[in-house]
Amino acid sequence: MSEALNELATYLTEVRGALISSSEIKYGELNVTTTAENVIALLTFLRDDAKCGFVNMTDICGVDWPQRPDRFDVVYHLLSPKKNLRIRIKVPVAEDQPVPSACGIYPGADWFERETWDMYGVLFTGHPDLRRILTDYGFEGHPLRKDFPTTGFVEVRYDDAAKRVVYEPVELKQEFRNFDFLSPWEGTDYVLPGDEKAKA
């Protein structure tokens, strides 16, 4: 498997090296980094080239790196059933930088791009129907961003008296607490209060 991935990495560098920023093999997959400007050309090549044959897009997802200037990685996961190989294409983009839609190449990218936009706020230009897919229509923000509050902004509940769903600001019943527990697999070198009762 790794020999086939090494051959593929070498082939891509020789034939389409101008489209690739970097590549490495990790966890049994070839990881290729490219730019938003080159992603469509690279995806088209990977699908159409006889030595590649990546005809199946299995997923598009996002990764949030708030400390980086290019805050998000848009990650495309492709499968070549004929070659039995997988490849991961990473596209680092800034918060306000759009990415061209891959729907024209892989029709299945439609919902994947909608999910990535809904969860992270990454904009896909040329998408036929870019709207929320997992959150409510009036939802504010993008919940998988690392700066999104864990509690959210609003609480949604059914009001039996009003006979409808109501949206209210989140009201925490207790102050925020940091639950920092020891791992049950690590244990301690000392006896915690109450442990002596458990051993008896």
Swiss-Prot record:
It comes from the Bacteria. It holds the Pfam family Complex1_30kDa. It is a peripheral membrane protein. SUPFAM superfamilies: Nqo5-like. GO terms for cellular component: plasma membrane. It is found in: Cell inner membrane. Coiled coil: none annotated. Gene3D superfamilies: NADH:ubiquinone oxidoreductase, 30kDa subunit. InterPro entries: NADH_DH_suC, NADH_quin_OxRdtase_su_C/D-like, NADH_UbQ_OxRdtase_30kDa_su, NADH_UbQ_OxRdtase_CS. Its EC number is 7.1.1.-. The keyword Transmembrane does not apply. The keyword Cell inner membrane applies. Its main location: membrane. One of its GO terms (molecular function) is NADH dehydrogenase (ubiquinone) activity. NDH-1 shuttles electrons from NADH, via FMN and iron-sulfur (Fe-S) centers, to quinones in the respiratory chain. The immediate electron acceptor for the enzyme in this species is believed to be ubiquinone. Couples the redox reaction to proton translocation (for every two electrons transferred, four hydrogen ions are translocated across the cytoplasmic membrane), and thus conserves the redox energy in a proton gradient. Belongs to the complex I 30 kDa subunit family. NDH-1 is composed of 14 different subunits. Subunits NuoB, C, D, E, F, and G constitute the peripheral sector of the complex. This is NADH-quinone oxidoreductase subunit C. It comes from Rhizobium rhizogenes (strain K84 / ATCC BAA-868). The gene is nuoC.
